[in-house]
Amino acid sequence: MARFTLPRDLYHGKGALEALKSFKGKKAIICVGGGSMKRFGFLDRAESYLKEAGMKVMIFDGIEPDPSVETVMRGAEAMQKFQPDWIVAIGGGSPIDAAKAMWIKYEYPECTFEDMCKVFGIPELRKKAHFCAVSSTSGTATEVTAFSIITDYSKGIKYPIADFEITPDVAIVDPELAETMPKKLVAHTGMDAMTHAVEAYVSTANSDFTDPLAIHAIEMIMNDLVPSYNGDMAARDRMHNAQCLAGMAFSNALLGIVHSMAHKTGAVFADYGAHIIHGAANAMYLPKVIAFNAKDETAKKRYGVIVDYMGIAPKDASDDEKVKALIAYLRGMNDQLNIPHCIKNYGADSYPCEQGFVPEEVFLERLHDIAVNAIADACTGSNPRQPSVEEMEKLLKCCYYDTEVDF
């Protein structure tokens, strides 16, 4: 038996943030990063709408990109003191992901972070509070998913929390919020969304319910991501819907090893000042993983179907030719978005940059542990081709050096 779960309500279109006025409750806590949502007035608007609904409002701000276990615990402690019956997370993937984990700890104070990371092992929520997610970036789609990503910086590892219990009750997809994204964020989150859709379509858990969402998301991203990156606000608005569709698909079809690798490489080089932003990691790894997965005949045929919908190769081309066309197309899209093709070149587009570089000797020294951790990641189980540790090491090397995947 399979399951398909979405938020009960999804408000979309410009002005959708006003839906907060209709919420019923006594207290609401707003979880936010604090930067752009404050600067552009969306935090003030959210607070005023909730107060208009008759609620007392508390703001928990300062949630960092790639939120830490410590931030989750601080937020849960604030919730215990305030006792909200609504948790409203507003911003990109980081504040929403953090708030989801805080929600678990708020409802179950005895729950440890290790408990949260047990796949589909979260106890029943909503005994204390309901959850609303308001997305401001067009990529993570965490506003509609059963996932959260939290980083344990003491280990340098990002851990996915996966359970349908943390699917938000309400999602607000208001494109006005996404219009504030800086150019680089448009690129990274957009390729995150493309990866979600492609991985969902070839996942071993794909279904008749998720396939149409994934394919339509791919078509929309193909048409709108690069124009959005170049300042077309109508395309930016459509991308906000596209990434949400991709999220609905992958939340139910699950993901694959692009995400496993991104989770385990994102923070592991942080001690060298080299943080590989999640969307950029996905963009770099996706073409390599497609080449690896295409050795599986079922996956190869499904990549071929994606190419048929995209129209980037003749219908009568072989599946092998279609896979090559898809890889070439995605690499070309990365070029247009100024995203490098490999870890070795990561950060070269904006030196000196906030990400830093990943030294070759450090990468090779940590390669085995990264491979082991990637295989243990929750996303690996639904990948169409299961890699050995040795194969994962080879694949990661291809992602570092931008070499051909021929195994």
Q: Would you name each region that the model predicts?
A:
Residues 147-253:
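Carboxylate- and glycine-rich phosphate/diphosphate-binding segment that chelates Mg2+/Mn2+
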Residues 204-213, 228-238, 253-258, 276-279, ...:
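Flexible, glycine/charged-enriched surface loops at secondary-structure junctions
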Residues 139, 244-282, 377-381:
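Glycine-rich phosphate/pyrophosphate-binding beta-alpha loops
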Residues 361-407:
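Short, amphipathic C-terminal "tail helix"
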Residues 268-271, 275, 279-362, 405:
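Gly/Pro-rich interdomain helix-loop hinge
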Residues 70-176:
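Glycine/threonine-rich beta-strand-loop-alpha-helix active-site module
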Residues 1-86, 343:
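ATP/NTP phosphate-donor binding region
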